[in-house]
Amino acid sequence: MTSNQLAQYIDHTALTAEKNEQDISTLCNEAIEHGFYSVCINSGYIPLAKEKLAGSNVKICTVVGFPLGANLTSVKAFETQEAIKAGANEIDMVINVGWIKSQKWDEVKQDIQAVFNACNGTPLKVILETCLLTKDEIVKACEICKEIGVAFVKTSTGFNKGGATVEDVALMKQTVGNIGVKASGGVRDTETALAMIKAGATRIGASAGIAIISGTQDTQSTY
C-alpha cells in the first residue's frame, strides 16, 4: 500500500480540550497536504475547518456525546443536527456504555436510532469503547448497529483506558460484515495501522496520521 492510499484511510484527529484555533488550522492544512480522508474535530471548530478546507476533498468529521456517551438521547440528536447544519460531513457518536452494562439494550438501540435519524443520510459511526466491553457486548452492540444501518462501528474514543486492538477490530468486522470498521485510539505508526487494516479496519482515527504515512512513530500522540 502506498502512502497516498494509506492516507485515505485516516481521519486526522484533534479532540483534546486544549486544542486552539491554530492547532485546528494546522490540522486542516496537514490534511490537505497529505491527502487524509477527513479531519475529526469537536463541533465548535466546524466553521473554522469549513473555511480552511474550502475547495479541498477533505471531509469534516465531528463527535457527538463525546467522550462519555451518557448524554440524554434527545441532546445527542440535537447535537447531531446542529453539527450537520454547521457543515459536518460525518458523525462519530459515543454509545451509552452504562446502558450496555445495565443490559438496557432497547435503550441502547433507541439512542443510536435517534442519532441515525438525525443524521438524515450523513454517515454515522458508532463508538463502542471496546476497552470497557466484554466480547459478547461488542458483538451485541455491533449487531444493533448493523440492524440500524450505520456506516461504521468504531473501537474507541481514545480518552479511556485502552484503544483499538487487532482482536477487537477483527471481531467487529466479523460481526458487521459490509459495514465499515474504524480503529482509533493508540494507532501511532505504520505497522499498527496496517495490522488494523488487515484485521478489517476500513478507517483509522489518529492524531499521528503524518507519522503513520511516513513510516515513523509518533510518541507524542494520545489518540
UniProtKB/Swiss-Prot annotation:
Enzyme type, top EC level: lyase
Primary subcellular site in the record, as a coarse category: cytoplasm
Active site (UniProt): D92 (proton donor/acceptor), K154 (schiff-base intermediate with acetaldehyde), K182 (proton donor/acceptor)
Family matches, as CDD domains: DeoC (cd00959)
Record's GO cellular component terms: cytoplasm
Record EC number: 4.1.2.4
UniProt keywords, alphabetically: Cytoplasm, Lyase, Schiff base
Subcellular location: Cytoplasm
Molecular-function GO term, any one: deoxyribose-phosphate aldolase activity
Catalytic activity reported: 2-deoxy-D-ribose 5-phosphate = D-glyceraldehyde 3-phosphate + acetaldehyde
Pfam families in alphabetical order: DeoC (PF01791)
Annotated GO biological process: 2-deoxyribose 1-phosphate catabolic process; carbohydrate catabolic process; deoxyribonucleotide catabolic process
Keyword Lipoprotein found: no
Keyword 4Fe-4S: no
Pathway assignment: Carbohydrate degradation; 2-deoxy-D-ribose 1-phosphate degradation; D-glyceraldehyde 3-phosphate and acetaldehyde from 2-deoxy-alpha-D-ribose 1-phosphate: step 2/2
Family to which this protein belongs: Belongs to the DeoC/FbaB aldolase family. DeoC type 1 subfamily.
Role noted for this protein: Catalyzes a reversible aldol reaction between acetaldehyde and D-glyceraldehyde 3-phosphate to generate 2-deoxy-D-ribose 5-phosphate.
Protein name (Swiss-Prot/TrEMBL): Deoxyribose-phosphate aldolase
